[in-house]
């Protein structure tokens, strides 16, 4: 028989090594994985995989093009050598380490790919991959500012804080925003918002509020000091340090997860309306002769006022505190004690609205731009009460009646008031009736009986005028008397 096409494959094989090193012994079992790619000298995958053996590592996904290799360093180890046998001479090996958090290669080749052409001399077929470990973790202080101040709210950057280390050196400074959150920056010039750690350990700090050189009146500053213990650990060895913190106040026991500084603000102040009085009719102002009241929405009197001689009205102060900051109040203003009959009083009820604001340094008061006076629904810029003076009065004319030869009895005789001597033009009252009167009974002392006549009411228009009246006895019908027909009494105003 004839045999043809017999091929003898005498490809020589050898080995190569992969040494895994770390810069310091690991303190716990640590795994590293590599992708090992292989090709023969012609660039094709390796066929006889059974020849390839790996010692010192766990192999997975082995195929014609390569395999995945896991290298495990035990606690305290810092290097391990893995050997690959049954590798054809001339094979091309590419080793790529899979990235591991926290670990970085020391002086890696380009693209971090280790290339190896297998030579017959196994000692020349060696690759060493060295890694170093680094980890970091931040601590961001958790601090809030609370202001107990009624309607007064926090202002941006109103309060300052400092964080010091155990040596008393300032490591961070901070200030608040209007919502109370305190943001810190490092004092090293980089102004980072957190302190970064690269090694496990325990760190102690203090946090306190910095009182300003000039303290605001009405503000009580916090004297609380927090001691913060920051604990840094590396439980997962993944490059990410675990950072925890506990806050302890010097004012209370127990750990807290954050620090809170509480300040209080107290303030007080007053406001009063500006209103005037106008009195027409020729009369002069009597100081304190007119009274006024200011009432709140519940109709409670909160202020009273009196006029001055120039017509200005002085009100008592309405008091406010920090609890009133930001609130808007509406009051009514009206004239009271309307008792004089010669005055026509103003029935107007003014309303005034005012917003109370913080003036700073413990003082509150009205926002003058918010003060609005209204009469009914109409805005007025100068609220004024207008009163009218109406003068009136009458003169009283008195006389006596003497009766000869008989005792005078009350009402026996009638007397009238006249504009003329002849008694033809009687003086009449407001109802149009002639003004008359009768005598009283005779006095014991002189036997005379008094009578009284009142003139008509005078008004302010009559001031300075002169009025002449005649008083006459009006004859009666009793024939036993002889009546006096002479009128001889006058009244001058």
Where are the regions that the model predicts?
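Solvent-exposed loop/turn and edge beta-strand elements of beta-rich ligand-binding domains
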Residues: 1-493
């Amino acid at each position: 028989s004839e045999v043809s096409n017999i091929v003898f494959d005498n490809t020589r094989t050898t080995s190569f090594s992969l040494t895994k090193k770390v810069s310091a012994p690991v303190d716990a079992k640590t795994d590293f994985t590599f992708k090992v790619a292989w090709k023969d000298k012609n660039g094709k995958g390796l066929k006889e995989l059974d020849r390839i053996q790996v010692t010192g590592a766990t192999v997975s996904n082995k195929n014609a093009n390569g395999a995945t290799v896991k290298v495990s360093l035990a606690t305290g180890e810092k290097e391990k050598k893995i050997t690959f046998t049954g590798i054809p001479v001339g094979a091309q090996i590419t080793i790529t380490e899979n990235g591991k958090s926290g670990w970085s290669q020391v002086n890696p080749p380009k693209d971090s790919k280790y290339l190896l052409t297998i030579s017959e001399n196994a000692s020349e077929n060696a690759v060493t991959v060295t890694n170093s470990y680094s980890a970091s973790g931040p601590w961001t202080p958790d601090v809030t500012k609370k202001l107990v101040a009624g309607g007064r709210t926090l202002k941006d950057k109103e309060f300052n804080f400092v964080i010091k280390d155990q040596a008393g050196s300032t490591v961070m400074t901070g200030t608040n925003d209007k919502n109370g959150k305190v943001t810190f920056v490092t004092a090293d010039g980089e102004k980072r918002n957190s302190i970064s750690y690269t090694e496990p350990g325990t760190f102690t700090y203090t946090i306190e509020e910095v009182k300003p050189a000039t303290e605001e009146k009405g503000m009580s500053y916090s004297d609380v000091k927090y001691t913060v213990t920051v604990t840094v650990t590396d439980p997962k060895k993944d490059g990410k340090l675990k950072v925890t913190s506990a806050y302890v106040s010097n004012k209370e026991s127990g750990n807290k997860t954050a620090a809170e500084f509480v300040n209080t603000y107290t303030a007080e102040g007053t406001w009063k309306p500006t209103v005037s009085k106008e009195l027409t009719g020729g009369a002069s102002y009597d100081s304190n002769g007119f009274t006024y009241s200011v009432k709140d929405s519940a109709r409670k009197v909160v202020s009273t006022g009196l006029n001055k001689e120039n017509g200005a009205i002085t009100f008592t102060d309405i008091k406010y505190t920090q609890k009133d900051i930001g609130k808007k109040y509406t009051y009514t203003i009206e004239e009271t004690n309307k008792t004089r009959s010669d005055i026509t009083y103003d029935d107007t009820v003014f309303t005034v609205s005012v917003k109370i604001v913080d003036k700073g340094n413990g003082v509150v008061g009205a926002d003058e731009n918010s003060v609005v006076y209204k009469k009914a629904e109409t805005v007025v810029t100068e609220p004024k009460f207008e009163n009218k003076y109406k003068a009136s009065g009458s003169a009283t004319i008195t006389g006596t009646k003497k009766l000869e030869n008989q005792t005078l009895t009350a009402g026996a005789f009638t007397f009238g008031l006249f504009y003329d001597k002849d008694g033809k033009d009687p003086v009449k009252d407001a109802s149009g009736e002639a003004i008359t009167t009768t005598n009283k009974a005779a006095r014991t002392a002189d036997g005379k009986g008094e009578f009284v006549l009142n003139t008509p009411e005078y008004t302010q228009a009559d001031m300075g005028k002169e009025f002449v009246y005649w008083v006459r006895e009006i004859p009666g019908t009793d024939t036993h008397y002889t009546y006096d027909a002479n009128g001889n009494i006058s009244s001058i105003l």
